C-alpha cells in the first residue's frame, strides 16, 4: 500500500541541503518526485547533475517519479521519454503536455505512469487503466497564496478518478526550507498552506482517502517525518498539546469513544484514569475554544474525571475545567 509512507519532492537546486534529512529515509522505498523541466535549473552541467542526483536517490532506496515534458527530450538529447526513464532509472513517469495517447499507452504497458489530475478525462484513459501497469493521477501544488484548490473541487476530482481505478496523489507543504521564489509552501489544498505537514497528511489520508501524499516543498523537519512515519506504522494519531494543568497526560495513548458527537472527542479511558478518592476541584472553568482539552470536576458528580477535546466552540461551564490546548497548527487533526 502506497500510503504507508510519505513521498518527497527533490529539486536539483536544493538537493545538497535535502540530502541531510533524506539520508536513511529510503529504506521503505518511498516515492520521490523529480521534475525534469524546471527552466531555472538548466545549466551546462544539468544532465550530469541530474544523473548524479538520481543515482544517489536510487542508491538510497527511493523510487523516482520523474516529471517529463517534450522539453526534457531536448535537454537529454534523446528521442523518447523511455530513454530518459532508462538513463535515470526511474520508477514512474509523470507525463504532462506534449504526449499523444498512443505514446502514453505504450509507456503504460511498461511502467507506472502519472497523469495530471486536473486535466485528465476519465473516459479518455479507460484503456490505459485496463491495459497499463498502474495509472496514477497527481494533483498540482500551488506556490502562490490563494490559488490552491478548494475542498469541493478537490474531492469531486479525486473521487471520480478513484472510481475509475486510478490512484490519486496530492501534495502537502513542508515546514522548513520552503521552495522559492515565493516561499509560502507547496500544498495542493489552499487551507493546508499554514498548518503542520502532519495535520495536512492526516487530512488527506483519513478524510479525503488520497492514495499517496508527497511533500511539495524541499524541506520537512525530522520531527514531522517521524510523526507521519509513526502514524503509518502504528495507526496511532499524534496530538501535540500543552497540558498546563495535567502533566500526567503527556504521552498517554487514549481511545476516542466511537459515539463522540461532532463537537467533542470523548476520551474512553479518562474516568478509569481517575483515582477513586481523587478530588478534582473547579479550576480554569473558562470558555471552551476549539482545541481545548477539558476535564469535568467534582461538581459534575459521577462524570468527574471525564476528559474531552473540543471540536466546536462551547460556552464556559463551572463543572468543566480546561486542562490544556491542542497546538494551533494541528487543530485540523480533530
Feature map (PLM): residue ranges:
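Short secondary-structure transition/capping segments
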Residues: 9, 76-88, 107-120, 161-165, ...
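Short acidic, gly/pro-rich beta-turn/loop elements at beta-sheet edges
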Residues: 18, 76, 147, 225, ...
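Active-site beta->alpha loop and helix N-cap motifs at the rims of alpha/beta catalytic domains
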Residues: 3-130, 134
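Electropositive, surface-exposed helix/loop patches at the edges of structured domains
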Residues: 66-81, 97-105, 152-156, 206-215, ...
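Short, flexible, solvent-exposed loop/turn segments with mixed acidic/basic and small polar residues
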Residues: 1-2, 205
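Catalytic alpha/beta core domains of metabolic enzymes, predominantly
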Residues: 116-243
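C-terminal functional modules
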Residues: 242-334
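Residues in well-ordered beta-strands of folded domains
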Residues: 9, 138, 240, 308-310
